[in-house]
Amino acid sequence: MHTTFRVVAIGMLMLLAATAPALAVGPQDGAYAIIESAPGSSDLQTTLVVLQEGTALGLALLFPEGFWVFGSGTLSPSNQIQGSLFQADGTAYGSFNLTIADGHVNGTIVEEGTTYSAAGQRIF
């Protein structure tokens, strides 16, 4: 009986391991190293985390200081997404208009009234 349980448990683990790659939801999923630049401002280095399910995308911008904001939107056929950004407590923070394709991100991010050009590539 104990051996049967082990065989079943090992079989379940092997099944889960085999299906894990199929659980990757969308081609835009991942973390992207982003440089945000605006005239008269220092460049900002941020990390953009993207989660995709179908055409729905959720994203978070992680700043080196430990601050983060989030947003969501629908990915267009041309791989463009736009929407609002919010702080962790739900307070409005800004907006974004990005194109995410082939491991690269380009577009604009508005943070507290300043418009930044954003560009970067997937890091994982």
Language-model features, listed with the residues they occupy:
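Bacterial N-terminal signal peptides
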Residues: 8-18
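Sec/Tat signal peptide C-region and signal peptidase I cleavage site
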Residues: 20-24
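Bacterial N-terminal signal peptides that target proteins for export
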Residues: 1-9
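Central antiparallel beta-sheet cores of small beta-barrel/beta-sandwich binding domains
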Residues: 25-101, 106-124
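A detector of low-complexity, intrinsically disordered, Ser/Thr/Gly/Pro/Ala-rich segments
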Residues: 1-2, 17, 106
